[in-house]
Swiss-Prot record:
Keywords: Toxin-antitoxin system. It comes from Methanocaldococcus jannaschii (strain ATCC 43067 / DSM 2661 / JAL-1 / JCM 10045 / NBRC 100440). The lineage of its organism: Archaea, Methanobacteriati, Methanobacteriota, Methanomada group, Methanococci. InterPro entries: Uncharacterised_MJ1172. It comes from the Archaea. Antitoxin component of a type II toxin-antitoxin (TA) system. Its cognate toxin is RelE4 (Potential). This is Putative antitoxin RelB4.
């Protein structure tokens, strides 16, 4: 079961036109579906790589197949990679 949240929002005329364009382009039933589509599309660009499942899998493979480098502390990390 998908829970839906109802919201009353103020948007500009231009953004309203964009929502209508998305609604027509994807043959959506209403503006709510258009807004959800816009958010789904934008989420790919918004989410950081660290949050994506592909990134987590990539890190797991690296950790399994490569020998880790012991750093120790933040100070050691800075010395090693920043030359501080």
């Amino acid at each position: 079961m998908i829970l839906m949240v109802k919201a009353i929002v103020d948007i500009t005329d231009e953004n309203n036109r964009i929502i209508n364009i998305v609604k027509a382009k994807y043959n959506l039933r209403d503006k709510s579906q258009a807004i959800n589509k816009i958010i789904e599309e934008y989420a790919e660009f918004l989410l950081e790589d660290e949050l994506k499942p592909e990134y987590i899998e990539k890190i797991r493979n690296i950790m399994k197949n490569e020998k880790p480098i012991y750093i120790g502390s933040i100070e050691n990390l800075k010395k090693r990679y920043l030359g501080e």
